[in-house]
């Protein structure tokens, strides 16, 4: 059981910016104290991610190789069939994953056979004993309600960056539309998975601003993925330099302090980190990782590598329990 922690929804930009710029050891100590109080036991959730609909997206997100506006090697592919998706979910469950996330490269959910297939996938994933998460762009109230009825655990819809930096990253969807999507998901009774990306040319103040938006949601998102840009050839951000790994550690730590009971998920860009940097992220409060060899269209550490990482860090994950059963 987690201890009582102080949950705030009134964080100021100045407070968050000061945390991001505080001495690293002080920041890690504070994040550790919050994490131990709110989430004792160091249990790490393992989430597997599959691209159901790859490429051909109408959005122009500057970081994304799936956009039809860019010239990456990713091309539009047909949707995966329900059986193929559930077969992959079964493999993920057998490998020890807790959550199965499914992605559609869409601007918004489309009514019709594709949506009915999505609902079938959600039901099938839940029947396997896994949490089910979907990311597919904007949605209507009725679509959110039908997903909830199908058993959807979480809907992912990231903010990507701060309101101030947003227009330099995407022009085909407004920040307000993102916030409205989050509200529809919440009203349907589905939990939120919402975070962002660093390394896209934003300032420290932008990072603080994005975290402020997240931390002032009431309630906080249940899952907060922290991503580092994976610069892909053919996208507008292809030449963006890699971030210092300690910048990602700082983002994880501040997210943990601001949102004590949320799952802080170490997400895209993790493959660029060495083992020690990943363990620092776990120490800073990350309590979930994407587990499996790929994330949509980018690579991810191998399963055996992640098992070795978690063992070295001394943290528990569901595959430990499976092995002991």
Swiss-Prot record:
Reactions the enzyme catalyzes: (4R,5S)-dethiobiotin + (sulfur carrier)-SH + 2 reduced [2Fe-2S]-[ferredoxin] + 2 S-adenosyl-L-methionine = (sulfur carrier)-H + biotin + 2 5'-deoxyadenosine + 2 L-methionine + 2 oxidized [2Fe-2S]-[ferredoxin]
Residues that hold [2Fe-2S] cluster according to the record: 101, 133, 193, 265
CDD domains listed in its UniProt record: Radical_SAM
Database matches in InterPro entries: Aldolase_TIM, BATS_dom, Biotin_synth/BioAB, Biotin_synthase, Elp3/MiaA/NifB-like_rSAM, rSAM
Cofactor binding: number and manner: Binds 1 [4Fe-4S] cluster. The cluster is coordinated with 3 cysteines and an exchangeable S-adenosyl-L-methionine. Binds 1 [2Fe-2S] cluster. The cluster is coordinated with 3 cysteines and 1 arginine.
Domain Radical SAM core residues, every copy: 42-270
Binding-site positions, [4Fe-4S] cluster: 57, 61, 64
GO MF annotation: an example: 2 iron, 2 sulfur cluster binding
Coiled-coil residues: none
SMART domains in the record: BATS, Elp3
Keywords noted in UniProt: 2Fe-2S, 4Fe-4S, Biotin biosynthesis, Iron, Iron-sulfur, Metal-binding, S-adenosyl-L-methionine, Transferase
Protein's GO biological process: biotin biosynthetic process
Keyword Iron-sulfur attributed: yes
EC number: 2.8.1.6
UniProt enzyme class: transferase
Protein's pathway: Cofactor biosynthesis; biotin biosynthesis; biotin from 7,8-diaminononanoate: step 2/2
Cofactor(s) recorded in Swiss-Prot or TrEMBL: [4Fe-4S] cluster; [2Fe-2S] cluster
Its biological purpose: Catalyzes the conversion of dethiobiotin (DTB) to biotin by the insertion of a sulfur atom into dethiobiotin via a radical-based mechanism.
NCBIfam families tied to this protein: bioB
Stated family: Belongs to the radical SAM superfamily. Biotin synthase family.
Subunit structure: Homodimer.
Entry protein name: Biotin synthase
Native source species: Synechococcus sp. (strain WH7803)
Gene behind the chain: bioB
């Amino acid at each position: 059981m987690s201890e009582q922690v102080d949950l705030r929804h009134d964080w100021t930009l100045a407070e968050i910016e000061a945390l991001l710029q505080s001495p690293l050891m002080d920041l890690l100590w504070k994040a550790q104290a919050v994490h131990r109080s709110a989430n004792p036991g160091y249990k790490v959730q393992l989430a597997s991610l599959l691209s159901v609909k790859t490429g051909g997206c109408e959005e122009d997100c500057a970081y994304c190789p799936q956009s039809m506006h860019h010239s990456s090697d990713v091309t539009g592919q047909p949707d995966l069939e329900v059986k193929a998706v559930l077969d992959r979910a079964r493999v993920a469950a057998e490998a020890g994953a807790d959550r199965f996330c499914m992605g559609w490269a869409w601007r918004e959910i489309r009514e019709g056979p594709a949506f009915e297939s999505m609902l079938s996938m959600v039901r099938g994933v839940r029947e396997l004993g896994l949490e089910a998460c979907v990311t597919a762009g904007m949605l209507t109230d009725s679509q959110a309600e039908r997903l909830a009825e199908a058993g959807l655990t979480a809907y992912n819809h990231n903010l990507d960056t701060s309101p101030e930096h947003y227009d330099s990253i995407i022009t085909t969807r407004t920040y307000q539309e993102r916030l409205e999507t989050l509200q529809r998901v919440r009203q349907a009774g589905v939990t939120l998975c919402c975070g962002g990306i660093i390394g896209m040319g934003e300032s420290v103040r932008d990072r603080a601003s994005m975290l402020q938006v997240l931390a002032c949601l009431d309630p906080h998102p249940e899952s907060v993925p922290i991503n580092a840009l994976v610069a892909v050839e053919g996208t507008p951000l292809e030449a963006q330099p890699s971030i210092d790994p300690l910048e990602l550690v700082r983002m994880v730590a501040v997210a943990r302090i601001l949102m004590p009971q949320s799952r802080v998920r170490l997400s895209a860009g993790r493959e660029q980190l060495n083992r020690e940097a990943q363990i620092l992220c776990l120490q800073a409060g990350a309590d979930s990782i994407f587990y499996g060899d790929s994330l949509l269209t980018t690579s991810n550490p191998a399963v055996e590598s992640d098992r070795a990482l978690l063992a070295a860090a001394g943290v528990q994950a569901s595959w430990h329990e499976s092995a002991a059963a």
